[in-house]
Amino acid sequence: MSVNWLNLRPFNGSQHAAFEEICCQLAAAETPPPGSQFIRKGAPDAGVECYWTLPDESEWGWQAKFFLSPPNGNQWAQIDQSVKTTLEKHPRLSQYVVCLPIDRQDPRIDNQQWFMDKWNEHVQQWEGWASAKDMAVVFEYWGAHELFARLSREEHRGRY
């Protein structure tokens, strides 16, 4: 079984908004430490669609991009800009989840750059940006598998 993201029902007039909302609802259902507070943002969003503020005041943030194929140069630039903005506007960020409705290709073919290779390069760059601001941020990926695994849980029945 799988999710056909092309059939995602629009929310507030667009599939992109629907994808953001699904990602935020799944983020809201994560289990942070007791005493944490969940915040859903509207646009403009300072680089995150939603985030958790934990009792130690650190933050976990989520960014959703409704890209149905591996990101091209312009799309990577959009993700990079979101990361830069988040690092600037959320200085207590400790975890950042990028959500795309696709899994990362990883054929490991010499002299070729695939999605996983580019992801790893960008994470290394983002970690450098965070380090330059004296931040330690864990960058995570929620793709089709991670999203479907969460949507398949009984408590999320009917969200898609």
Regions found by a protein language model. Name each.
Residues 1-160:
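Mixed-charge (Asp/Glu-Lys/Arg
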